Amino acid sequence: IIWKAEDDWKSGQGKLSMKDKLNFSSINVLVVGDLMLDKNVLGYSNRLSPEAPVPVFIPDGQKNFLGGAGNVVRNLFDLGANVKCVGIVGDDNGGDEIIKISNTLNANILKNIVIAQEHQTTIKERIYLGKKQILRIDHEENINSKYDQIILEKCDQLIASSDILILSDYDKGVLSSNVLHSLVQKAKELNIPTIVDPKKTDFSHYSGSNIITPNLYEFKKA
Protein backbone atom coordinates (compact mmCIF):
# COMPACT_ATOMS: atom_id res chain seq x y z
CA ILE A 1 0.00 0.00 0.00
CA ILE A 2 1.54 3.28 -1.09
CA TRP A 3 0.72 6.54 0.66
CA LYS A 4 3.33 9.25 0.83
CA ALA A 5 2.85 12.33 2.98
CA GLU A 6 4.14 14.57 0.20
CA ASP A 7 1.25 13.41 -1.96
CA ASP A 8 -1.10 15.36 0.30
CA TRP A 9 1.08 18.45 0.02
CA LYS A 10 1.37 18.26 -3.75
CA SER A 11 -2.37 17.80 -4.18
CA GLY A 12 -3.35 20.73 -2.01
CA GLN A 13 -2.85 20.05 1.71
CA GLY A 14 -4.70 16.81 2.25
CA LYS A 15 -7.47 16.94 -0.34
CA LEU A 16 -6.83 13.44 -1.63
CA SER A 17 -9.71 11.03 -1.11
CA MET A 18 -9.08 7.90 0.93
CA LYS A 19 -9.24 5.88 -2.29
CA ASP A 20 -6.47 8.04 -3.75
CA LYS A 21 -4.37 7.75 -0.61
CA LEU A 22 -4.64 3.96 -0.55
CA ASN A 23 -3.15 2.64 -3.75
CA PHE A 24 -4.06 -1.03 -4.05
CA SER A 25 -3.29 -1.42 -7.74
CA SER A 26 -0.18 -3.51 -7.12
CA ILE A 27 -1.73 -5.68 -4.39
CA ASN A 28 -2.88 -9.24 -5.16
CA VAL A 29 -5.53 -10.33 -2.66
CA LEU A 30 -7.03 -13.78 -2.22
CA VAL A 31 -10.42 -13.76 -0.48
CA VAL A 32 -11.77 -17.08 0.79
CA GLY A 33 -15.12 -17.30 2.51
CA ASP A 34 -18.88 -17.48 2.52
CA LEU A 35 -20.46 -15.86 -0.53
CA MET A 36 -23.95 -14.43 -0.13
CA LEU A 37 -26.50 -12.46 -2.07
CA ASP A 38 -27.95 -9.39 -0.37
CA LYS A 39 -31.43 -8.95 -1.80
CA ASN A 40 -33.27 -5.75 -0.91
CA VAL A 41 -36.99 -5.76 -1.75
CA LEU A 42 -38.45 -2.26 -1.77
CA GLY A 43 -42.13 -1.47 -1.46
CA TYR A 44 -44.96 0.42 0.15
CA SER A 45 -48.28 -0.13 1.90
CA ASN A 46 -51.56 1.72 1.53
CA ARG A 47 -53.84 -0.48 3.59
CA LEU A 48 -54.04 -3.01 6.41
CA SER A 49 -54.74 -6.68 5.85
CA PRO A 50 -58.28 -7.82 6.71
CA GLU A 51 -56.78 -11.11 7.95
CA ALA A 52 -54.51 -9.64 10.64
CA PRO A 53 -53.50 -6.19 11.95
CA VAL A 54 -50.53 -5.96 9.59
CA PRO A 55 -49.83 -3.79 6.54
CA VAL A 56 -50.25 -5.22 3.06
CA PHE A 57 -46.81 -4.98 1.46
CA ILE A 58 -46.71 -4.04 -2.22
CA PRO A 59 -43.26 -4.59 -3.77
CA ASP A 60 -42.20 -2.07 -6.38
CA GLY A 61 -38.46 -2.59 -6.70
CA GLN A 62 -35.51 -4.82 -5.92
CA LYS A 63 -31.78 -4.27 -5.58
CA ASN A 64 -29.22 -7.07 -5.38
CA PHE A 65 -25.71 -6.76 -3.98
CA LEU A 66 -22.77 -9.02 -3.22
CA GLY A 67 -22.87 -10.00 0.44
CA GLY A 68 -20.64 -11.85 2.88
CA ALA A 69 -17.24 -12.52 1.34
CA GLY A 70 -18.59 -10.99 -1.85
CA ASN A 71 -18.89 -7.62 -0.15
CA VAL A 72 -15.20 -7.83 0.78
CA VAL A 73 -14.40 -8.61 -2.84
CA ARG A 74 -16.45 -5.64 -4.04
CA ASN A 75 -14.76 -3.22 -1.63
CA LEU A 76 -11.28 -4.41 -2.61
CA PHE A 77 -12.14 -4.14 -6.29
CA ASP A 78 -13.36 -0.57 -5.78
CA LEU A 79 -10.00 0.23 -4.15
CA GLY A 80 -8.20 -1.05 -7.23
CA ALA A 81 -6.84 -4.32 -5.84
CA ASN A 82 -6.23 -7.38 -7.98
CA VAL A 83 -8.63 -9.69 -6.21
CA LYS A 84 -9.49 -13.36 -6.60
CA CYS A 85 -12.13 -15.22 -4.62
CA VAL A 86 -12.71 -18.82 -3.61
CA GLY A 87 -16.12 -19.75 -2.26
CA ILE A 88 -19.23 -21.80 -2.94
CA VAL A 89 -22.58 -20.94 -4.49
CA GLY A 90 -25.51 -23.16 -5.35
CA ASP A 91 -26.65 -24.09 -8.83
CA ASP A 92 -29.65 -21.79 -8.50
CA ASN A 93 -30.92 -18.28 -9.20
CA GLY A 94 -29.06 -16.84 -6.21
CA GLY A 95 -25.77 -18.30 -7.39
CA ASP A 96 -26.40 -17.07 -10.93
CA GLU A 97 -27.04 -13.55 -9.62
CA ILE A 98 -23.80 -13.54 -7.59
CA ILE A 99 -21.85 -14.58 -10.68
CA LYS A 100 -23.68 -12.02 -12.83
CA ILE A 101 -22.91 -9.14 -10.45
CA SER A 102 -19.28 -10.24 -10.10
CA ASN A 103 -18.85 -10.41 -13.86
CA THR A 104 -19.84 -6.74 -14.12
CA LEU A 105 -16.76 -6.01 -12.01
CA ASN A 106 -14.30 -8.45 -13.55
CA ALA A 107 -14.98 -11.83 -15.13
CA ASN A 108 -11.92 -13.33 -13.42
CA ILE A 109 -12.92 -12.49 -9.84
CA LEU A 110 -15.09 -15.58 -9.32
CA LYS A 111 -13.27 -17.76 -11.82
CA ASN A 112 -12.35 -20.15 -9.00
CA ILE A 113 -15.64 -20.49 -7.16
CA VAL A 114 -17.30 -23.86 -6.69
CA ILE A 115 -20.86 -24.38 -7.92
CA ALA A 116 -22.47 -27.02 -5.71
CA GLN A 117 -25.38 -28.77 -7.39
CA GLU A 118 -27.19 -29.70 -4.16
CA HIS A 119 -26.39 -26.55 -2.20
CA GLN A 120 -28.69 -23.56 -1.72
CA THR A 121 -27.02 -20.19 -2.19
CA THR A 122 -27.19 -18.06 0.94
CA ILE A 123 -29.55 -15.13 0.41
CA LYS A 124 -30.24 -12.37 2.92
CA GLU A 125 -33.57 -10.93 1.78
CA ARG A 126 -34.42 -7.63 3.43
CA ILE A 127 -37.90 -6.16 3.11
CA TYR A 128 -38.08 -2.36 3.14
CA LEU A 129 -41.35 -0.53 3.71
CA GLY A 130 -40.38 2.88 2.41
CA LYS A 131 -36.98 3.55 3.96
CA LYS A 132 -37.55 1.29 6.96
CA GLN A 133 -36.46 -2.34 7.06
CA ILE A 134 -39.34 -4.36 8.51
CA LEU A 135 -38.19 -7.93 7.97
CA ARG A 136 -35.24 -10.10 6.98
CA ILE A 137 -35.67 -13.54 5.46
CA ASP A 138 -32.62 -15.84 5.48
CA HIS A 139 -32.43 -18.50 2.78
CA GLU A 140 -29.45 -20.64 3.72
CA GLU A 141 -27.97 -23.99 4.59
CA ASN A 142 -24.49 -24.87 5.80
CA ILE A 143 -22.00 -26.31 3.36
CA ASN A 144 -20.98 -29.94 3.69
CA SER A 145 -17.40 -30.64 4.76
CA LYS A 146 -16.96 -32.81 1.67
CA TYR A 147 -16.07 -29.59 -0.15
CA ASP A 148 -13.05 -28.93 2.09
CA GLN A 149 -10.57 -30.57 -0.26
CA ILE A 150 -11.98 -28.80 -3.31
CA ILE A 151 -11.66 -25.43 -1.57
CA LEU A 152 -8.07 -26.17 -0.55
CA GLU A 153 -7.13 -27.28 -4.06
CA LYS A 154 -8.55 -24.06 -5.50
CA CYS A 155 -6.61 -22.00 -2.95
CA ASP A 156 -3.37 -23.88 -3.60
CA GLN A 157 -3.49 -22.65 -7.19
CA LEU A 158 -3.79 -19.01 -6.08
CA ILE A 159 -2.20 -18.40 -2.70
CA ALA A 160 1.45 -18.42 -3.83
CA SER A 161 0.80 -15.46 -6.15
CA SER A 162 -1.09 -13.49 -3.48
CA ASP A 163 0.22 -10.69 -1.28
CA ILE A 164 -2.57 -10.94 1.30
CA LEU A 165 -4.97 -13.70 2.34
CA ILE A 166 -8.37 -12.59 3.65
CA LEU A 167 -10.63 -15.15 5.32
CA SER A 168 -14.23 -13.91 5.43
CA ASP A 169 -15.98 -16.28 7.82
CA TYR A 170 -19.76 -16.18 8.27
CA ASP A 171 -19.78 -19.72 9.68
CA LYS A 172 -21.70 -21.17 6.73
CA GLY A 173 -19.21 -23.97 6.13
CA VAL A 174 -16.65 -22.79 3.57
CA LEU A 175 -14.12 -22.01 6.30
CA SER A 176 -14.30 -25.21 8.31
CA SER A 177 -11.71 -25.83 11.03
CA ASN A 178 -9.76 -27.98 8.59
CA VAL A 179 -9.76 -25.32 5.85
CA LEU A 180 -8.89 -22.52 8.28
CA HIS A 181 -5.94 -24.40 9.76
CA SER A 182 -4.60 -25.46 6.36
CA LEU A 183 -4.85 -21.99 4.81
CA VAL A 184 -3.34 -20.15 7.77
CA GLN A 185 -0.42 -22.58 7.91
CA LYS A 186 0.15 -22.37 4.16
CA ALA A 187 0.15 -18.56 4.31
CA LYS A 188 2.67 -18.63 7.17
CA GLU A 189 4.97 -20.89 5.17
CA LEU A 190 4.82 -18.44 2.27
CA ASN A 191 5.15 -15.40 4.56
CA ILE A 192 1.78 -14.06 3.40
CA PRO A 193 -0.17 -12.03 6.00
CA THR A 194 -3.60 -13.38 6.89
CA ILE A 195 -6.55 -11.20 7.88
CA VAL A 196 -9.66 -12.82 9.35
CA ASP A 197 -13.18 -11.44 9.62
CA PRO A 198 -14.44 -13.89 12.28
CA LYS A 199 -17.83 -15.38 13.04
CA LYS A 200 -16.94 -18.36 15.20
CA THR A 201 -17.01 -17.52 18.91
CA ASP A 202 -13.92 -19.63 19.58
CA PHE A 203 -11.13 -17.48 18.18
CA SER A 204 -8.64 -20.33 18.57
CA HIS A 205 -9.92 -21.48 15.16
CA TYR A 206 -8.04 -18.50 13.73
CA SER A 207 -4.79 -19.18 15.58
CA GLY A 208 -1.75 -18.19 13.53
CA SER A 209 -3.46 -15.43 11.56
CA ASN A 210 -1.97 -11.93 11.66
CA ILE A 211 -5.08 -9.81 12.17
CA ILE A 212 -8.59 -10.63 13.42
CA THR A 213 -11.30 -8.01 12.89
CA PRO A 214 -14.38 -8.81 15.00
CA ASN A 215 -17.10 -6.23 15.49
CA LEU A 216 -18.08 -5.36 19.07
CA TYR A 217 -20.83 -7.99 19.21
CA GLU A 218 -18.51 -10.74 17.95
CA PHE A 219 -15.79 -9.61 20.36
CA LYS A 220 -18.12 -9.81 23.36
CA LYS A 221 -19.27 -13.31 22.40
CA ALA A 222 -15.72 -14.64 21.99
Where are these regions (language model features)?
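Accessible peptide chain termini
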Residues: 1-2, 18
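Ribokinase/PfkB-type carbohydrate-kinase core domain
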Residues: 14-46, 61-222
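Extended active-site and interfacial segments that coordinate phosphate-rich ligands
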Residues: 47-51
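Divalent-cation-assisted or electrostatically stabilized phosphate/pyrophosphate-binding catalytic cores
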Residues: 53-60
